[in-house]
Swiss-Prot record:
It is found in: Plastid, Chloroplast. Keywords: Chloroplast, Plastid, Ribonucleoprotein, Ribosomal protein. This is Large ribosomal subunit protein bL36c. GO terms for molecular function: structural constituent of ribosome. Its main location: plastid. One of its GO terms (cellular component) is ribonucleoprotein complex. HAMAP family: Ribosomal_bL36 (MF_00251). Signal peptide: none annotated. NCBIfam families: rpmJ_bact (TIGR01022). Belongs to the bacterial ribosomal protein bL36 family.
């Protein structure tokens, strides 16, 4: 899980979602997991 000031899609399978007021990226590739904060 990467924590970044700006999250973006790294591939076409990445999905941007909001959980508990946090913007997150979920993907089949675990290296692409990101959280904004």
């Amino acid at each position: 899980m990467k924590v970044r000031p700006s999250v973006r899609k790294m591939c076409e399978k990445c999905r941007i979602i909001r959980r508990h007021r946090k913007v997150m990226v979920i993907c089949n590739n675990p290296k692409h997991k990101q959280r904004q904060g």
